[in-house]
Design a protein with these regions (language model features):
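Secondary-structure transition/capping motifs at alpha-helix termini
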Residues: 135, 185-192, 305-310, 334-340, ...
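PLP-dependent aspartate aminotransferase-fold enzymes
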Residues: 1-6, 88-99, 105, 109-344, ...
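Glycine-centered flexible beta-alpha turn that most often forms the glycine-rich phosphate-binding loop
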Residues: 383
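PLP-dependent enzyme catalytic core of the Aspartate aminotransferase-like
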Residues: 464-467, 471, 483, 487-488, ...
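Active-site C-terminal subdomain of aminotransferase-like
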Residues: 355, 406-440, 466-515, 520-738, ...
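N-terminal entrance/gating region of PLP-dependent enzymes' catalytic architecture
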Residues: 1-163, 173, 186-194, 217-232, ...
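Short secondary-structure boundary/capping segments
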Residues: 181-185, 303-309, 359-364, 394-407, ...
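Conserved PLP-binding catalytic core of the aspartate aminotransferase-like
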Residues: 721-807
């Protein structure tokens, strides 16, 4: 297992402390130099004499700091691999150092005027997160010495759709902001339609079920119900169409003035965003759909946005705690029958309680079904605050993608090797295979020529066809040889995507003509298949292979070898579908291993900024209107048409950076969070080879714990030679991510109440109840876990029916509805657990299981004794 990720953390025993301290001191020294170098001729204020006079105050500060550090020691050891309770873990050294450096400068990231450096870092870092999630980031302005082609690409990219993301204080604010945008985008077309009718504007839109070839509809010809249910992206681009129509109605008016007129007209509409919501909500009451496993912030958002928590419809979950898409379809249809409109569906990309991932790909299919069959669409938001960074596993570098494709080609050509091959070796095998074919074809051409010569000498046969065959073979061989030379060139310069592209063309154009004997059938398969692309099956198979490990479950003289893997096609399909949703929440301060507070909200279409923009006269920002659409960082006032006509130098233009403040829900926000995220992302890129290593380690540790829990009941009785008074009970399928939920069943009390009592008792062994005023230190606590309660209002009985049947519980349904089910929860995000097992002779998962066994056996005895008394 690659342990490179251990270089990015301080270590469970602060093993990397020397590097950390040295770098921290370098940051402090540089900061001090920065202060001293600004107007160095200014007078010193605090003299040595004054410092001596201030010794009492300095002593007080030092004493208070000492007291503070003493009190902080009562903290839970979140950094330790023994802490597996809540979504807390060690944070990376880049994030700590970045936060500390950014904190010293204390910039306010609302605007470049208050944060000239960290605002740019936030844009940079969030662009990397957009890429990780599958969204396209805004184009980066070319450098001054860029080529004309680079500028042409930049101009073209500006006209395409790209995403936008920014830092929030956390997932709650990110969810609220995403649903705020969804609400505005949903009802915006009503205001445009009303203005278009009163002002005589000509605007066209497409209904959700329209095919690409269908003509659009005039906006004033559609009913209000039809217009309020158009696709989110259609509504977003409607803003630009509206401003363009206003421009046509106000000829010879400056573009900024046109924007003001458009805003004024919209503000006067009774459906406008500035009007009260009573009118629009009474006509078209909104509904948000999410599962019972969703975060409570969804209902909080509904209250804040005036939608009301009662209009958040809870969708059933299946036995793996994933949203039941069939029930979602049923609930949406019920809402439509009641005259309500689906505002948004909030899917969860790893639930807080169980780490479950909703089937986003199936929800997208359902949305398409509603669009095609009922002309109804809705916003799809994914709350992936916890699991968003798992997407780094699927961000492959060019060489990795090409290597997987070459494996498929080698398999088809039946060129197999027992040992792992490098990318270069795979390429050489393919080149050798095709070059061998040229040798065979050349021999065949020679044979044909020899036959002709022999026949002409003997004058026994007509040689016309043999001559043609030999000629065709030689012509084909000549063209084929040139293409092979081209393939070799791309391989030598390591342009692997061009190599694959050329290989595909070669096979399509020459494959069956040139391939000889045994390869011909294989080449025909290559010509007809999508083997040059990575399918969902390919991604699923190779990811499961990458996130796999061999473990040993050993206790006393008994042991079993296990191969553990993470993934599966439904789960991988969900993550890969993120790129097609409208917005995503992801928390760097969770599986990004960044300090709190650092959440991120990401939008697929940057143009949503037009819908939520506020104006603050004290914040300077470039012009924003729907016709001239620039990303947050862009070339100021560039006129590409004029530039081409005058052939002016590109370096006369300046890069402008927009303020965040007008476009976000929050106000002031720390530049330190941006510095932390930027340094972390720059040091640990968000791809499989880097951040993916941390994620891999975490997922495998969770799978190992699940395997121990699932095997323990039978395995332990054999190994220990005695009967257990309890059973560890998991919920069937392996966990979707790195949260492992389980309960402990009392063998002498086969009721839910029995499970709840024993589970609660065991929990007390693994916690310091600070929330109840317990102020003890954590030094003697061997492990920490958390608990949660599954209740009928959020988790339907059907989700647990299989679990209850496996446990042979009596009166399970009635008891569950009355009392709920208490479960233990292990959040395995610590980056050290798997590495400790592999690099040392210690297995912390095994140690935890043994401690859990002791606590369970002891608690079960205690409960038996209480019942006897």
């Amino acid at each position: 297992m690659d342990d490179k990720h251990l270089a990015w953390f301080l270590g469970p025993k602060a093993e990397n402390s020397e590097l950390f301290v040295d770098t921290l001191m370098a940051i402090i020294q540089d900061y001090i130099h920065w202060r001293r170098n600004y107007y160095p001729s200014d007078n010193l204020l605090i003299t040595k004499r004054m410092q001596r006079e201030h010794e009492e105050e300095h002593d007080k500060l030092y004493q208070n700091v000492t007291e503070m550090m003493s009190l902080l020691r009562r903290n839970f050891p979140f950094y330790s691999p023994r802490y597996i309770a809540h979504m807390l873990s060690d944070v990376s050294m880049p994030s700590m150092l970045g936060y500390f450096a950014g904190m010293l400068y204390n910039s306010n990231n609302v605007t470049p005027e208050a944060a000239p450096v960290t605002v740019e870092w936030e844009i940079e870092a969030c662009n990397e997160i957009l890429k990780m999630l599958g969204f396209k980031p805004a184009p980066t302005p070319p450098k001054k010495d860029a080529s004309k082609k680079d500028w042409e690409v930049y101009e073209r990219e500006l006209k395409s759709q790209f995403g936008w993301g920014h830092i929030t204080s956390g997932g709650t604010v990110a969810n609220i902001e995403a649903l705020w945008v969804a609400r505005i985008v949903k009802y915006f077309p009503l205001a445009v339609q009303e203005v278009a009718k009163t002002k005589g504007l000509s605007i066209e839109v497409k209904k959700p079920g329209a095919k690409p070839t269908d003509e659009p509809n005039k906006i004033d010809e559609l009913s209000k119900y039809e217009i309020v249910n158009i696709k989110p992206n259609e509504s977003i681009y409607l803003y630009a169409k509206f401003v363009d129509a206003v421009k046509q109605a106000n000829q010879n008016t400056e573009i900024d003035k046109v924007g003001e007129i458009a805003s004024d007209w919209l503000s006067k509409s009774k459906y406008g965003v500035g009007a009260h919501l009573g009118k629009v909500f009474s006509e078209f009451p909104p509904v948000i759909f999410t599962s019972g496993a969703a975060h409570y912030s969804v209902k909080k958002a509904a209250d804040i946005l005036g939608i009301g928590r009662n209009n958040v419809v809870v969708v059933k979950t299946d036995s793996q705690f994933r949203m039941d898409v069939k029930d979602l379809e049923l609930k949406i249809n019920q809402a439509l029958d009641q005259g309500k409109v689906p505002l948004a569906v909030v899917a969860v990309g790893s639930t807080t309680e169980e780490g479950a991932v909703d089937p986003v790909h199936e929800i997208l299919d359902l949305r398409e079904k509603f669009q095609n069959e009922k002309d109804i669409s809705f916003w799809l938001h994914v709350d992936s605050a916890w699991g968003g960074y798992i997407a780094s596993l699927f961000r492959l570098e060019e060489e990795e993608e090409v290597s997987i494709i070459l494996d498929k080609i080698l398999f088809q050509l039946n060129i197999l090797d027992s040992k792992p091959l490098s990318l270069g070796e795979k390429i050489q095998l393919i080149l050798n295979s095709f070059e061998n074919d040229t040798i065979e074809v050349a021999k065949e051409a020679d044979n044909q020529s020899n036959k002709v010569e022999t026949a002409e000498t003997s004058k026994e046969t007509d040689t016309k066809f043999e001559k043609e065959d030999a000629s065709v073979l030689r012509q084909t061989l000549e063209g084929y040889g040139g293409r092979l030379d081209s393939l070799s060139y791309w391989a030598n310069v390591k342009d692997y995507l061009s190599f694959i592209s050329e290989l595909k063309k070669l096979i399509v154009d020459f494959g069956t003509k040139i391939s000889f004997k045994k390869n011909r059938d294989a080449i025909e398969k290559l010509s007809d298949s999508k083997i040059f692309e990575l399918s969902i099956t390919d991604r699923s198979d190779e990811t499961s292979e990458y996130v796999s490990d061999k473990i040993t479950i050993k206790l006393n003289n008994h042991q079993e070898e296990r191969l553990i893997k993470w993934g599966g096609k439904p789960l991988i399909s969900s993550f890969l579908a993120f790129k097609n949703v409208d917005s995503i929440t992801v928390d760097p301060h969770k599986m990004g291993y960044i300090q709190y507070p650092c959440g991120v909200v990401a939008f697929k279409n940057d143009r949503v900024r037009h819908f939520i923009m506020q104006r603050a006269p004290y914040i300077t920002s470039s012009s924003h209107n729907a016709l001239i659409h620039n990303p947050p960082r862009h070339i100021k006032n560039i006129d590409f048409k004029k530039l081409k006509e005058q052939n002016a130098p590109y370096d006369v233009y300046q890069i402008g950076t927009d303020a965040f403040a007008p476009f976000i829900l929050e106000g002031s926000k720390p530049g330190a969070a941006a510095a932390s995220l930027w340094l972390s992302t720059k040091t640990v890129p968000l791809n499989r080879k880097n951040h993916g290593l941390i994620i891999r380690s975490s997922l495998l540790a969770a799978r190992e714990l699940y395997e121990w829990l699932n095997s323990w009941n039978k395995f332990a009785e054999k190994a220990l030679g005695k009967n257990l008074l309890y059973e560890f009970t998991t919920f069937g399928a392996v966990p979707d991510t790195n949260v492992v939920v389980f309960a402990i069943k009392d063998k002498n009390n086969e009721t839910i109440n029995g499970i709840n009592k024993l589970t609660e008792q065991v929990y007390n062994y693994f916690t310091i109840q600070a929330e109840l005023g317990d102020k003890q230190h954590s030094y003697s606590q061997p492990f920490f876990i958390s608990k949660t309660k599954m209740e009928h209002n959020y988790y339907n009985f059907d989700s647990f029916e299989g679990f209850f049947n496996d446990c042979n519980l009596r009166s399970a349904k009635r008891e569950y509805i009355e009392k709920g089910l208490t479960v233990l929860r292990a959040t395995i995000m610590n980056p050290y657990i798997s590495s400790i097992r592999q690099k040392t002779d210690q297995n912390l998962v095994k140690e935890f299981i043994i401690e859990l066994h002791k606590a369970s056996q002891s608690s079960a005895r205690k409960l038996i004794k209480e019942e006897e008394e």
